[in-house]
Amino acid sequence: MMTFSELPPVPSDHLVLLSDQLRLAVAAYLARFKGASRYHTESDLRCYLAWCAEHDLDPLAARRPHLELYIRWMQEVRRFKPSTVSRRFSVAAGFYRTCVIDGLMEHSPAEHVRRPAGWRPAAWCK
């Protein structure tokens, strides 16, 4: 498996330049939710953004391997239950879907990420 250090670095000055754009992207995504859903979605997105910050990764420059490493981190380092990993990844994927809708990205880096084991669609999707 590829490690984070094998991925090309994202220059830290790039992070500063995109901070306003990232804030706008986060606000646009969270605006789609209200009440408890917004609160819990914000918490899950905050976890992903913190992971990105720990790895000096601009979330708007993330690629598919970064998201797969995020999943592995949740599974192997944090030892989250499969349902938690699935939910938190779904929030990150939704964030990127909104970025594509809003024209901030051409395509979502989450689009072809292998879903974690134990993932299944929500009951209402069946």
Where in the sequence are the language-model features?
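Short alpha-helical hairpin
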Residues: 12-26
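N-terminal helical hairpins
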Residues: 1-10, 95
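Short linear motifs at secondary-structure transitions and domain/linker junctions
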Residues: 6, 15, 35-36
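N-terminal core-binding DNA-recognition domain of tyrosine recombinases/integrases
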Residues: 26-39, 46-124
